[in-house]
Amino acid sequence: MAPSMKEIFSKDNFKKNKKLVLLSAAVALLFVAAVAGISAGASKANEKRTLSPSSHAVLRSSCSSTRYPELCISAVVTAGGVELTSQKDVIEASVNLTITAVEHNYFTVKKLIKKRKGLTPREKTALHDCLETIDETLDELHETVEDLHLYPTKKTLREHAGDLKTLISSAITNQETCLDGFSHDDADKQVRKALLKGQIHVEHMCSNALAMIKNMTDTDIANFEQKAKITSNNRKLKEENQETTVAVDIAGAGELDSEGWPTWLSAGDRRLLQGSGVKADATVAADGSGTFKTVAAAVAAAPENSNKRYVIHIKAGVYRENVEVAKKKKNIMFMGDGRTRTIITGSRNVVDGSTTFHSATVAAVGERFLARDITFQNTAGPSKHQAVALRVGSDFSAFYNCDMLAYQDTLYVHSNRQFFVKCLIAGTVDFIFGNAAVVLQDCDIHARRPNSGQKNMVTAQGRTDPNQNTGIVIQKCRIGATSDLQSVKGSFPTYLGRPWKEYSQTVIMQSAISDVIRPEGWSEWTGTFALNTLTYREYSNTGAGAGTANRVKWRGFKVITAAAEAQKYTAGQFIGGGGWLSSTGFPFSLGL
């Protein structure tokens, strides 16, 4: 019996043998098309079963919360053949239809690679970037369906909400990333035009799923908390009536042991923090004294889809290579010998033919990636435009005591949940950018001297949908200038950021801001684009550049005055850090 499309593109089969799966899918699609052509109009008995009135009602109610309700309804109605009894059913049906659309986009890209004449090297690279982001999108959507099957029983409601929103937010980001690869010149834009319709369709389908997920989880959380509040009040009233005093010990959450470590930190995590006594699974040394001579070789030899931490010790030295920690390389840790001693460096850049996405010296995608005591560097100068030192799409990733050094687009916080602590990030234009949910704590963020006529932008956040749980949070950091900029800072305007995408979200809080930052604080991208839809916030900052009296007057900018409002941007809430940061072994703060 011929396999069904669902079987062909099941998560397990897709991951086991992607090329075989996609070939089988192509054959299956041709077979289905042939059968459809023969049987068209033969009998009404073969038509898709229409939705029942009750399913229609559920569908319309669920789609009412989306940004594209007509698409939301028509996609499911056209597919037919499903019984919808809840909003979760509608979300699952919508996501499954989105998977089919993503599969179609895959074949569109493959066809362009094979048949399009005269593709430039960068266009070929951009198309392969699209294949990579399509691969990631398929994984994310399959995982979304699996998580929906478990909802709401296997995790807390907030964990479910965080995971589901992150998966779909990342899927949306991937569509934008594919298209962004064709934005460098006019020739690129012709290829972009061939992809645009399919990519935008998937992005809109994902947007609808995200809106429904947000509506469902927000409602369920509110109902749960209301019930918990009533239960708590009833218990309190009963205790007061009985004149009973209940003592609750919460001090343990912040207790320290005799050596000054938090009591909840395991011995293994303490060793990671101390940076000594950690057993490496592989050692990289340029002089041949380790297991491998290159970082890329060590990563290639690491196990795939591992649930156990795999530590790669990178000895002191300069490693001139480009490294990718792919999606299947999970739980990898890079441990250097010091941020000034272990350096991974490259020079890929847009001017010389790369895409921004592909220019990264190091790209970390496999989930739970950790790095400490390393410098990630791109030596392409300011004249080479976009040249990324580090790109991160790894969920639950963290970086401690690392340097990210480049000029334009230094740190690409691409997608998923990320954390940086005690790091140095230096650059010029948009040097912290992307659409992850990321918190940077206790970091030094330094603008460098750019080319003549350029302006420095610390951030360029890329949120494209108001329901994405993404943004850049800079907390308890120091924002200043490198020595080469400090003496000429008046000649090179420097800003906290500008809106790369329509719903750009950036928060600067509890940080020291030097006078390198101009009084208006923030800059436009172009004209009035995104000024009413962005979310830019400042809270409790200090320093000569922290004054807000002369800040921009955009509708999307606001100075936060209440701690309760700032709390939602902390590591505990914004990236759900309470559930995973302790496992990194790195220092962190969950609150203000």
UniProtKB/Swiss-Prot annotation:
Root EC class: hydrolase
Keywords linked to the UniProt accession: Apoplast, Aspartyl esterase, Cell wall, Cell wall biogenesis/degradation, Disulfide bond, Glycoprotein, Hydrolase, Plant defense, Secreted, Signal
Active-site residues, Swiss-Prot/TrEMBL: D409, D430
Regulation: Regulated negatively by pectinesterase inhibitors (e.g. PMEI3, PMEI4, PMEI7 and PMEI9) in a pH-dependent manner, mainly in slightly acidic conditions (pH 6.0 and 5.0), especially in dark-grown hypocotyls; this processus relies on changes in the protonation of amino acids involved in intermolecular and intramolecular interactions.
Site (Transition state stabilizer): Q408
GO annotations of cellular component type: apoplast; cytoplasm; cytosol; plant-type cell wall
InterPro entries, A to Z: Invertase/methylesterase_inhib (IPR035513), Pectin_lyas_fold (IPR012334), Pectin_lyase_fold/virulence (IPR011050), Pectinesterase_Asp_AS (IPR033131), Pectinesterase_cat (IPR000070), Pectinesterase_inhib_dom (IPR006501), Pectinesterase_Tyr_AS (IPR018040)
Catalytic activity: [(1->4)-alpha-D-galacturonosyl methyl ester](n) + n H2O = [(1->4)-alpha-D-galacturonosyl](n) + n methanol + n H(+)
Gene knockout outcome: Early germination and reduced root hair production associated with lower expression of several pectin-degrading enzymes, genes involved in cell wall organization and remodeling and genes involved in lipid and protein metabolism, thus leading to a global decrease in proteolytic activity, however, cruciferin genes accumulate abnormally. Normal sensitivity to zinc Zn(2+).
Inducers of expression: Induced by necrotrophic pathogens such as Pectobacterium carotovorum and Botrytis cinerea.
Stated role: Acts in the modification of cell walls via demethylesterification of cell wall pectin. Required for zinc Zn(2+) homeostasis and to monitor Zn(2+) influence on cell wall-controlled growth processes such as root cell elongation. Monitors seed germination and favors root hairs production. Prevents cruciferin seed storage proteins activity, but promotes the expression of genes involved in cell wall organization and remodeling as well as genes involved in lipid and protein metabolism, during post-germinative growth of seedlings. Confers sensitivity to Zn(2+) when overexpressed.
Record note on quaternary structure: Interacts with BIIDXI and At5g11420. Binds reversibly to PMEI4, PMEI7 and PMEI8 to be inhibited; the stability of the PME3-PMEIs complexes and the inhibition of the pectin methylesterase (PME) activity is pH-dependent, based on protonation status of amino-acids at the complex interface.
Protein name: Pectinesterase/pectinesterase inhibitor 3
Organism listed in the record: Arabidopsis thaliana (Mouse-ear cress)
Organism classification: Eukaryota, Viridiplantae, Streptophyta, Embryophyta, Tracheophyta
